[in-house]
Amino acid sequence: SLEQIKKNKGYKFVRQAEEDVILATENNIKIISTGGSAVYSDKSMAYLSSFSKIIYINTPLDLIKQRIGEGQERGLAAPDGMDIDDIYREREPLYTKWADITLDGKKSIEEIITTIIDLI
């Protein structure tokens, strides 16, 4: 599991592995759903921006918590001691920075999918 890898090798290993995979991705893929920590790598985000539109599904923290809980059981590529609130506050400005398009994450999954299909 991601949490086991993080415990054994550290969260920076997870982030580096994520960056390596992104940079090895060919630019002919239509949709790439990255891990949440991909946004920490300027190199990865610049690469993705070079051939695609980056879509940020802006979802309020309380709704994220409803969907995934507090994150303790979920593997998070973040330093120990950071909770989902800390991660959200740290990542949200980065998602905004890199987004070409921002969608409302409060909408239904069906509405979001329809919007994305219309965009691509």
Protein language model annotation of sequence segments:
Residues K6, E18, E26, R67-I68, ...:
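Short, flexible helix/strand-to-coil boundary loops that buttress conserved ligand/catalytic motifs
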Residues G35-V39, P60-D62, S108:
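Short glycine-rich anion-binding loops that position phosphate/pyrophosphate groups of nucleotides
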Residues S1-Y47:
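ATP-dependent small-molecule kinase phosphotransfer cores
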Residues N28-I29, F51-S52, W98-A99:
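Short, well-ordered alpha-helix to beta-strand connector turns
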Residues F51-P93:
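A glycine- and Lys/Arg-enriched "phosphate-lid" helix/loop adjacent to the NTP-binding pocket
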Residues E92-I120:
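NTP-dependent small-molecule kinase module
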Residues K43-A46, Q66-E70, T114-I117:
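Short amphipathic alpha-helical segments
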